[in-house]
């Protein structure tokens, strides 16, 4: 029996967000009963839904209540309906990026795991993926070109132009590098740092600082790769990677490549953390408005993100392990949602997958 009370802010958002979040509720309720944990969940508006109802993609009440919680469980935001409004009011920018900055969520963590029994999910040849996958992509989340100033547009006709600024401070690189190396110490003790140090000054600083941080972890091997080479090596020999450390832009791109290697972005979870282990947990995929409301979305990424919440913010690793075991047990038993059902495999819907995984948690 755990006597602590944990408050989780639930932000379902737009598109498939609400329906995959319903499956996360099933997992939370199952965990509460199985492990006798006091979990209080409260739902708040975010994204396009909040913009339509309250005039902001991130209402002040949502931020205020997130500040009082132990963690945020996030669905998805955005969709075509809000694509043509002012960019700072668009759900992706006005909600998600603002939350990252507000809570100083500088660490983005995406585990890419595929046991040998499930290598048929990967689009790669069996001989390439024969050892399965077990790597983690660590992405610096609130620095780099997405947040650098100035940025904007100017000029008219042939002189029309746009500009962004890539900037990294030493402290931003140091703190994310320390996190990556500490994580690697608990795993296979290998960090691959991604940059473009043959061209970009930000990457030159990145490589220098990461190398300096590495000296504090003599038992961890450091490898530097240019981002273009890294994208090729991930296809050629993904099993060689352990912890991948990336600046914001490169991490954004490579982590999605990792998702496809894994079989589907619908099974890839994500955690965004600050130095106090407060985190926002969300599926790596988007709001998928084209399949919203059809009960065919894959809830596994949302469920595995819930597992990460227990591991990193609530420090209940045994709960996280149980959830993860239930997910991979369901997949090993042959249950598939439409996006990962191949060779005429019968697929189950969103609700059924949530029920199956919840029932397996009870049995483990």
From Swiss-Prot:
GO terms for biological process: L-leucine biosynthetic process. Substrate binds at residues 100, 110, 139, 228. It is found in: Cytoplasm. Its main location: cytoplasm. Mg(2+) binds at residues 228, 252, 256. It holds the Pfam family Iso_dh. The record marks 146, 196 as: Important for catalysis. Pathway: Amino-acid biosynthesis; L-leucine biosynthesis; L-leucine from 3-methyl-2-oxobutanoate: step 3/4. SMART domains: Iso_dh. GO terms for molecular function: 3-isopropylmalate dehydrogenase activity; magnesium ion binding; NAD binding. HAMAP family: LeuB_type1. Belongs to the isocitrate and isopropylmalate dehydrogenases family. LeuB type 1 subfamily. This is 3-isopropylmalate dehydrogenase. It comes from Blochmanniella floridana.
């Amino acid at each position: 029996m755990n006597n602590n009370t944990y408050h989780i802010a639930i932000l379902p958002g737009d598109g498939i967000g609400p329906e995959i979040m319903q499956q996360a509720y099933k997992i939370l309720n199952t965990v509460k009963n199985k492990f006798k944990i006091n979990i209080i969940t409260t739902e708040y508006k975010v994204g396009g839904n909040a913009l339509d109802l309250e005039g902001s993609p991130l209402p002040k009440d949502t931020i205020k209540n997130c500040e009082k919680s132990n963690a945020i469980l996030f669905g998805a935001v955005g969709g075509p309906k809000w694509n043509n409004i002012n960019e700072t009011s668009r759900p992706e920018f006005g909600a998600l990026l603002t939350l990252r900055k507000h809570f100083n969520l500088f660490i983005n963590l995406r585990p890419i795991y595929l046991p040998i029994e499930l290598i048929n999910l990967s689009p790669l040849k069996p001989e390439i993926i024969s050892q399965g996958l077990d790597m983690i992509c660590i992405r610096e989340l609130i620095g780099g070109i997405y947040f650098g100033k100035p940025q904007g547009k100017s000029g008219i006709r042939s002189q029309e132009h746009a500009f962004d600024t890539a900037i990294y401070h030493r402290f931003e690189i140091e703190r994310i590098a320390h996190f990556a190396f500490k994580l690697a110490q608990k795993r296979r003790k290998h960090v691959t740092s991604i940059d473009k140090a043959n061209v970009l000054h930000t990457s030159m600083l990145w490589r220098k600082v990461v190398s300096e941080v590495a000296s504090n972890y003599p038992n961890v091997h450091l490898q530097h790769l240019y981002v273009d080479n890294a994208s090729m090596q991930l296809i050629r020999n993904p099993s060689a990677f352990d912890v991948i450390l990336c600046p914001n832009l490169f991490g954004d791109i490579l982590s999605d490549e990792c998702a496809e290697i894994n079989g589907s972005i619908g099974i890839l979870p994500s955690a965004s953390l600050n130095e106090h282990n407060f985190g926002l947990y969300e599926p790596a995929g988007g709001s998928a408005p084209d399949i919203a409301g059809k009960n065919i979305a894959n809830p596994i990424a949302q469920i595995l993100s819930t597992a990460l919440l227990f591991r990193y913010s609530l420090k209940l690793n045994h709960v996280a392990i149980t959830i993860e075991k239930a997910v991979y047990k369901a997949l090993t038993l042959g249950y598939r949602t439409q996006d990962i059902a191949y060779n005429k495999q019968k697929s189950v819907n969103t609700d059924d997958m949530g029920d199956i995984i919840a029932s397996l948690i009870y049995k483990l």
